[in-house]
């Protein structure tokens, strides 16, 4: 990745988008932390025969995560849960909410040509493609796929909002000649309204379970635990993402080596630590790298280890 990709490269964020969808579902009253959604391994829109399968679906049938709360939907990365949330929210409420995190606009303070990314709406699709918006478009956005596009800088800005418990600090890329930003006329941070402190704390906790939850059976373990959660000396909050680059017919069996490298999935991981009082937030994108937990998460841990442990920053 070249430096311009940080601010202008456009990518599907995959499951790293789920924390923001979850917060939107809380804000709009679609869910709470106790609601359970049945995940049999697939989702079906009302009146439709098409099955939208979860990543846990096993060829020949079966799979799924059982009864899923928002917290479990995070640490097991249940597509079915977030299909449900986005469908019930609807695209207008969903797109309006996530834009508050900087998605769909230039969220950088000092990079004029940074891309705005794309948070799609029915009006955008009609103008761009002269086509109607379908419910399937909405639920694809709910898992960070479809027409949705973000830059790595936007995702970094957004994850710091969660780390700051709702406080949006505009990102900046330029320092003065002395390597300082202290004298720059920066806009004041803003607080995303309507979300209680408890919901921010619960989302942070759910993201820590992505990394640290173990010893409860495979179907309850955090998706990143095996990759980075063992013997970690501080509490990290994170979320993995594996984003499709090209559409592959559902149910098709294939190996990554069957695809041209540029068509292979992108690996993402977003993280911050220490979770209780964050000192650093990290976004890792490995273009065409494969699974986020296996490929991108170890890079994120290496970066955070270097900052917190080797620089002697307090980790409590």
What feature does the model see in each segment?
Residues 1-15, 20-284:
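Beta-lactam-recognizing serine transpeptidase/beta-lactamase-like catalytic domain environment
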Residues 155, 292-304:
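Short, charged, low-complexity patches
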Residues 180-191, 299-316:
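Short, gly/Ser/Thr-rich active-site loops of penicillin-recognizing serine hydrolases
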Residues 287-290:
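A generic structural motif
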């Amino acid at each position: 990745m070249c430096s311009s990709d940080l601010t202008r490269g456009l990518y599907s964020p995959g499951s790293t988008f789920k924390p923001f969808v979850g917060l939107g579902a809380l804000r709009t009253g679609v869910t709470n932390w106790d609601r359970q959604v049945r995940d049999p391994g697939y989702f079906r829109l009302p009146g439709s025969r098409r099955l939208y399968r979860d990543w846990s679906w096993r060829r020949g049938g079966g799979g799924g995560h059982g009864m899923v709360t928002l917290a479990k939907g995070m640490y097991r990365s249940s597509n079915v849960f977030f299909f449900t949330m986005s469908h019930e929210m609807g695209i207008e409420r969903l797109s309006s909410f996530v834009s508050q995190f900087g998605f769909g606009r230039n969220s950088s303070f000092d990079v004029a040509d940074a891309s705005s990314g794309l948070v799609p709406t029915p009006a955008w699709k009609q103008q761009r493609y002269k086509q109607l918006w379908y419910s399937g478009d909405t639920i694809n956005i709910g898992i960070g796929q479809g027409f949705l596009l973000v830059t790595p800088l936007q995702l970094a800005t957004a994850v710091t909002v969660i780390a700051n418990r709702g406080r949006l600090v505009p990102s900046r890329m330029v320092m003065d000649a002395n390597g300082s930003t202290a004298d720059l006329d920066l806009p004041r941070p803003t607080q995303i309204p309507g979300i209680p402190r408890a919901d921010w704390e619960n989302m942070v906790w759910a993201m820590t379970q992505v990394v640290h939850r173990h010893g409860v059976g495979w179907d309850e373990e955090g998706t990143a635990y095996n990759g980075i959660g063992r013997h970690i000396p501080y509490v990290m909050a994170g979320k993995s993402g594996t984003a499709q680059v090209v559409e592959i017919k559902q149910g098709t069996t294939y190996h990554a080596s069957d695809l041209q490298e540029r068509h292979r999935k992108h690996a993402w991981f977003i993280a911050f630590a220490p979770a209780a009082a964050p000192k650093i937030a990290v976004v890792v994108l490995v273009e065409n790298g494969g699974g986020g937990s296996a490929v991108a998460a170890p890079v994120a841990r290496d970066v955070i280890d270097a900052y917190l442990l080797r620089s002697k920053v307090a980790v409590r």
